[in-house]
Amino acid sequence: MESLWNQLDQFTDAPTKQMLQALVKRKQKFENYAAQCRRWRWASLICLGLLCVMIMIKSPEPQLILQEILSHTFYLFWMLATAFAYCTSYYFKKKEEKSETDFHKLRCEIIQKSTDLWPQPDKWKARESVFHMMKHKYDINLYFESK
């Protein structure tokens, strides 16, 4: 990856290179939070499903489900685990949304300042190659501001 950034020296100056590196870091941070959120959502869904299945299997009658839940601490522990998994997924969802807005703001800033970062006649072709590399290597679209 470092050699890729060294190749950018011929196309960009140092501040632009730092902006692009920060953009890649923010994208990775956003993707990490999104993966964590998905992981905890699945964990909470599995915990809830297993809790429901265990209650339905162990409960002798449908009228006694509440009594069954309150009489065994195992069910209470399982409900706490489900609630913890859900709250953790909610936490990571908020972090994901914040990191997505940070990433999108920096991406839009680079797009808006592209005429300043790459002056028109001499480095405009370099801009195109940098945008192409960012699109194909990191899946970051610098052509348009829309998400």
Swiss-Prot record:
The keyword Membrane applies. Keywords: Cell membrane, Membrane, Transmembrane, Transmembrane helix. The keyword Transmembrane applies. One of its GO terms (cellular component) is plasma membrane. It is found in: Cell membrane. It is a multi-pass membrane protein. The chain crosses the membrane at residues 42-62, 64-84. This is Uncharacterized protein YpbF. The gene is ypbF.
